Amino acid sequence: MHDEAVFNAIAGEEKRQREGLELIPSENYVSRAVREALGSVMTNKYSEGYPGARYYGGQTYTDVVEDLARERAKQLFNCQFVNVQPLSGAPANLELYAALLNPGDTVLGMDLSHGGHLTHGHPVTLPAKIYNFVRYKMKNPDTGEIDYDEMREVAKREKPKIVLAGFSAYSRELDYDAFVSIAREVGAFAVFDIAHIAGLIAGKAIRNPFDAGFDVMTTTTHKTLRGPRGGMILTREDADIAKKIDKSVFPGLQGGPHMNVIAAKAVAFGEALTPAFGTYAMQILKNAKAMEVVFAKEKVRMLGGGTSNHLILADVFGSLGVTGAEAEKVLDEVGITLNKNSIADDTRKPMDPSGIRFGTPAVTTRNFKEAECTRVAELMIHTLKHKDEEKVKLDVRAEIKALAEKFPIPESFV
């Protein structure tokens, strides 16, 4: 059967990706090899359990790919235990909580409005209905510095079982040692949700939290890691913690793992083990810095004062008088995709906030360097300053399309 409606939608999305530039920090392009594994016959197989201990027969090759994924992840992140079965980042976090906490236990995580993630305790989420979340914030949103003194006082007062690092809209590097120190002081697990920066860690562009003593890390396998959409939980060295996590994932919260996705994870982790991936990770940072320079020159306020990672959060409403939703829409019209985003202590509503969030993982995959990212940043600001001028938008759209044609999405990275 040829499903023309679905085929046309896929073809349209392929054209959109090919002719435009992707600046959403959590998005990236995967290789043809990853896509082939994702679309392979592994999708047909049920594999409840773990390698060597399955509840169904016929597991010879599924065990091979899961073992490959686990061993490659251990090499990438320098740890002893890995579970590659989580379906994505949010399930991985819930499974981590279920493994280490009892209902009502406390977690200390980053406030959503200061860069945290929904799964770090926002009241609308399931974890917040089961566990007690308390929050830390930035001392000064213009520098991005976390108030570690206040964080320590909150930890001493609230006695969390988990001290949680990690973010979805924070552009600076956290003080790993401070997190671990605070966790140790109150007898908590030190956990890092590295979903956004996993590829930067794997590529050795930034420090590995395990080297600072974190106990567990959760992550997605897409974003900067450039794999399929999925999740993973990594344990530094404690076998008892790893055993609890395995039981929490299966049978605790999941049934049969998606073996096609695990096969694709194994391929992506193999790609990330190559020297080329380290070069890629470093270039992500260089490209983000190049964009920071342009926004600073144009006096557009950036949360944290700039970036130390792959993303930038810009206050376009305060600096340019354009709301985040307006900016997202007009930039989409010229072929630049990013997302509207609330900023620290934003007075506007989440669907029409003051900020935009953008980053460099996907354009770096297309082999953009500093010069190209500088030009894209200039075009972004030019478009926002002239958002009601059709000729400006047409000219920018033509230049973006030409850039996309000059730097096509690669089929292979190694």
Stretches found by the model and what they are:
Residues 2-4, 286-287, 350-414:
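PLP-dependent enzyme catalytic core of the Aspartate aminotransferase-like
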Residues 12, 64, 68, 154, ...:
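A non-catalytic, amphipathic alpha-helix used as a structural packing/dimerization or gating element
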Residues 13-19, 45-51, 160, 242-247, ...:
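Short acidic (Asp/Glu) and glycine-rich catalytic loops that position anionic groups and cofactors
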Residues 20, 52, 81, 256-259, ...:
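Flexible, glycine/charged-enriched surface loops at secondary-structure junctions
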Residues 68, 73-299, 316, 360:
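Conserved PLP-enzyme active-site core in the AAT-like
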Residues 266, 283-289, 305-313, 344-349, ...:
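A glycine-rich phosphate-binding loop feature that marks nucleotide/adenosyl-phosphate handling sites
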